[in-house]
């Protein structure tokens, strides 16, 4: 049972919208003990000399030891790798040059342009197997003066989807490119097993009341990590923020930009900060919107943010009078929702052969809160449907969307 409405949500929804394929990284961020602030710090350690213009997509672990340390969230060894997921062969050539000599081959996809490009599974071993990155571009209205790369966060949110909905009127002379980061979406993606495996993870009680529930949470997340390893093999070892930043530098190179112009939202701000640390001499115009907390207090600050957002919704609903069936004051709406979540903690709601748990319901509510006032009426309908009519389908569907769960 959560003492605060969204203490559970911060555990079950630590990011913007991670798809199923990114769930292993989401699980690592949400359910492991917090890392120390020094692990995730995006400040280059003191050195005699920093190379501000290293080779394309390069990374020197010695120069960025904090980012590559054994306690880094990106470097949690779970189980020995099992190479049971095939990859493509590297392009012809030798070393990194086999990739630097390539061009992006765009093709029309509706009103946009799309492309698949190979990148090394392991940038430290460019002669090894390759994986695929899926890109989408919205061309400039006229001759492109620059290229803007965008990332919606997650981690694991689809850059292709972001391009599809991106309001580019402010950038008429820019090509706007989004990509599904390695391990996600239409790129070579992490597979953690069938839908029932995802259900097992997301149905765990993320706000345990006692030691038995805590042990069940730990057991469930470990089982999920093992499933991801079994289905995805060595890909899991190469889906870190650093790997993605190196991919981004390679994309910058392929479009012919000397500097990176970039817009990152939520986790995308951490990716942007990581890029700026690795390649400070290549940063052009960079906007980091809704920056993540790089200390180990991110879960707490996110819970506070969700709780504040729900308070705004509760006040809006109460102000509607008879049109709000949840209460006549913010306190009443909040209490009714907390009581509903408490009931789900003890007795999950049956929904079409599945169960709407406390954690899933809180995650579903969070999806609507991301959209602010424009989603308030939909959130009201979802809550009334579940609390008054016994129909938890809308909240479960919203949770599935935020969790990236596919259809059965």
Model-based region annotation:
Residues 13-16, 36, 44, 53, ...:
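Intrinsically disordered and other compositionally biased segments
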Residues 74-360:
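Gly/Pro-rich cap/lid or specificity-loop segments adjacent to the active site
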Residues 7-30:
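C-terminal region of N-terminal signal peptides and the immediate post-cleavage residues
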Residues 64, 70-78, 334-408:
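Alpha/beta-hydrolase fold active-site neighborhood
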Residues 7, 21-22, 36, 40, ...:
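A generic alpha-helix propensity feature with a strong bias for hydrophobic helices
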């Amino acid at each position: 049972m959560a003492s605060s409405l969204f203490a559970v949500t911060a555990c079950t929804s630590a990011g913007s919208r991670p798809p199923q394929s990114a769930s292993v990284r989401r699980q690592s961020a949400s359910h492991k003990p917090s890392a120390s602030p020094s692990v995730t710090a995006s400040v280059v350690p003191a050195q005699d000399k920093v190379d501000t213009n290293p080779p394309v997509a390069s990374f020197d672990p010695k120069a960025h030891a904090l980012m590559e340390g054994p306690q880094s969230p990106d470097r949690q060894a779970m189980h020995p790798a099992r190479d049971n997921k095939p990859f493509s062969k590297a392009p012809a050539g030798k070393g990194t040059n086999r990739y630097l000599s390539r061009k992006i081959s765009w093709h029309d996809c509706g009103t946009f342009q799309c492309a698949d490009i190979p990148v090394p599974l392991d940038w430290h071993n460019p002669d090894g197997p390759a994986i695929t990155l899926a890109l989408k571009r919205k061309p400039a209205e006229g001759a492109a003066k620059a290229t803007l790369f965008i990332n919606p966060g997650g981690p694991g949110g689809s850059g292709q989807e972001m391009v599809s909905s991106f309001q580019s009127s402010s950038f008429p002379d820019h090509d706007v490119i989004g990509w599904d980061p390695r391990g996600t979406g239409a790129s070579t993606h992490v597979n953690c097993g069938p839908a029932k495996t995802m259900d097992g993870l997301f149905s765990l009680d993320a706000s345990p009341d006692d030691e038995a529930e805590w042990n069940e949470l730990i057991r469930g997340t470990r089982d999920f990590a093992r499933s991801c390893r079994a289905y995805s093999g060595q890909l899991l070892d190469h889906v870190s923020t650093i790997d993605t930043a190196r991919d981004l530098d390679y994309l910058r190179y392929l479009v012919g930009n000397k500097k990176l112009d970039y817009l990152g939202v939520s986790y995308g701000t951490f990716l942007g900060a990581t890029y700026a640390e690795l390649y400070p001499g290549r940063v052009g115009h960079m906007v980091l919107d809704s920056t993540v907390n790089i200390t180990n207090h991110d879960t707490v600050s996110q819970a506070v943010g969700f709780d504040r957002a729900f308070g705004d919704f509760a006040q809006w609903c109460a102000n509607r009078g008879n049109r709000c069936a949840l209460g006549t004051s913010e306190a009443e709406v909040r209490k009714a929702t907390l009581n509903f979540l408490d009931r789900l903690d003890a007795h999950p709601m049956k929904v079409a052969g599945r169960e709407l748990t406390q954690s899933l319901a809180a995650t579903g509510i969070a999806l609507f809160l991301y959209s602010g006032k424009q989603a308030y009426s939909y959130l009201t309908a979802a809550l009334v449907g579940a609390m008054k009519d016994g129909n938890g389908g809308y909240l479960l569907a919203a949770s599935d969307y935020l969790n990236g769960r596919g259809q059965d």
